[in-house]
Amino acid sequence: MTQADNQNPKPMVLIILDGFGESDETTHNAIKEANTPTLDKLFRHYPHTLLEASGRAVGLPDGQMGNSEVGHLHIGGGRKVPQDLTRIDAAIASGEFYENPALIEALEKAKALNKAVHILGLLSPGGVHSRDNQIAALVELAHRCGIKKIYLHAILDGRDTPPKSALLSIEKITDQFHAYGNGKIASLIGRYYAMDRDKRWDRTEKAYDLLTQGTAQFHAPTAKEGLMLAYEQGNTDEFVSPTSIHRHNETPITIEDGDVVVFMNFRADRARQLTYAFLDDHFTAFNRQVRPKLSAFVTLTAYAKDIHAAVAFPPLELHNTLGEYLSARGYRQLRIAETEKYAHVTYFLNGGQEAPFNGEDRLLIPSPKVATYDLQPEMSAVEMTNKLVEIIQNDDYDLIVCNFANPDMVGHTGDETATREAIQVIDDCLKRIITALQSVGGEALITADHGNAEKMFDEKTNQPHTAHTSNLVPLIYVGREAQFCKEVGALDDVAPTLLYLMGLEKPREMTGRNLITLK
């Protein structure tokens, strides 16, 4: 059937199950272990296929696991988008990184004033928010520029990496500092505090006070000893308490007037809150007892339009994304998600566009205020489904995009039982959504942005698996009689497929392909 013959269903709902990968493994697979009558029925009775969601298929290096930002960019973009990880690694390999104007200008200011350069960043090989080789490249660049005081304030991962795996990265960068003789790791803190994105400002405040005042629950003479101290307290990397690294008779190293700060996270969403604390003149989220007057603050990528900082790698602009294309044709669309994934169905799905397009409404369902989501694995899925069912029945939108955060956010805790419960909640929600859609003649495409919940234990490290995976993800069509092509697709094929089902040609900017044929 061609687009011309295709009757536009209303509404079309794109359901993104965040962190829902496909694996034949049944052991430690929370998806396979869960009781999922709705998903079982969908896979039995409706056309479905599998999609690549990692590596080169989503603009990342070979073997690099996907993530929510990359996944939504490709789902909404309908094309391969070179990712910041790949761009920056390529710049390091070519030498362009060491000539980057924003970095060079900031480092020269520090040198001229004989001030310190403070590097903030997730010290991790994970490649989701940062990569430790890029931090090492900046240390090398600062050394080349003749900076005498280079301080790394290391945020620790344990979420996109095994829970206790920071030591290798710490040892590598410590060896580099020893070789240069002009810097050190000045502090440690878990990403739980320094990289909150859900307005839990008390966590951000702890990170800010550590950086600006040296306020720390723990002190240690070396970063390795600080990490071991955290492990003794029962903390994994993600939850390392603020720890200042200095000898007993020395004062903490802090960010002071005239210093230069470079934030080396390339993913924006979890870097924003801490950046606002430094740069926002009208900041009110907590009381900044100290606010250093910096010579420069550089972000590796652009974090937000209202963050006024030098940017080392400005974003690539995407035109005619799914949202923009539908908006230009007068289609009404809704984006709905809970707090943890709201930016993904709005900003990232729109290719980095902050403001909604004409005809695009947005609905934010607050995520529950709990320390970790294994404590409330249902999160806000039921509340979101209640609203979604009501909206479907009102028949106001041509396209609705929703994201269920549970498989990813609960999967990140490493709690297999809680993740299984999360999957079962999602299954119940899907039943209600599909029932509502079928009552009004609507249709659904169900997919995921990357894997996670299908692997809850790592046999190699003998630790809970808290990171994403490189597994394929499903694509299920709930609607008219149709057949998917036999070849495995990729996330950039979702938008062209969706447009075909809505009776529209894809724009020329979309290089992804339609994967389905209506009978």
From Swiss-Prot:
Where, in this chain's numbering, is substrate bound? 129, 159-160, 191, 197, 267-270, 341
Question: Binding residues for Mn(2+) 1, per the UniProt record?
Answer: 408, 412, 468
Some GO term, biological process aspect, for this entry: which one?
Answer: glycolytic process
Q: Which residues bind Mn(2+) 2?
A: 18, 68, 449-450
Task: State how the cofactor is bound.
Answer: Binds 2 manganese ions per subunit.
Lineage, top-rank taxon, reads: Bacteria
Q: Could you tell me which Pfam families the record lists for this protein?
A: iPGM_N, Metalloenzyme
Pathway of this protein?
Carbohydrate degradation; glycolysis; pyruvate from D-glyceraldehyde 3-phosphate: step 3/5
Gene Ontology CC terms, in alphabetical order: cytosol
Reactions performed catalytically: (2R)-2-phosphoglycerate = (2R)-3-phosphoglycerate
Q: What GO molecular functions are on record for this protein? A: manganese ion binding; phosphoglycerate mutase activity
Q: What is its EC number?
A: 5.4.2.12
Q: What is the required cofactor set for this protein?
A: Mn(2+)
Keywords, ordered alphabetically: Glycolysis, Isomerase, Manganese, Metal-binding
What is its quaternary makeup?
Monomer.
Q: What does this protein do?
A: Catalyzes the interconversion of 2-phosphoglycerate and 3-phosphoglycerate.
Supply the HAMAP family for this chain. GpmI (MF_01038)
Q: What is this protein called?
A: 2,3-bisphosphoglycerate-independent phosphoglycerate mutase
The organism encoding this protein is: Coxiella burnetii (strain Dugway 5J108-111)
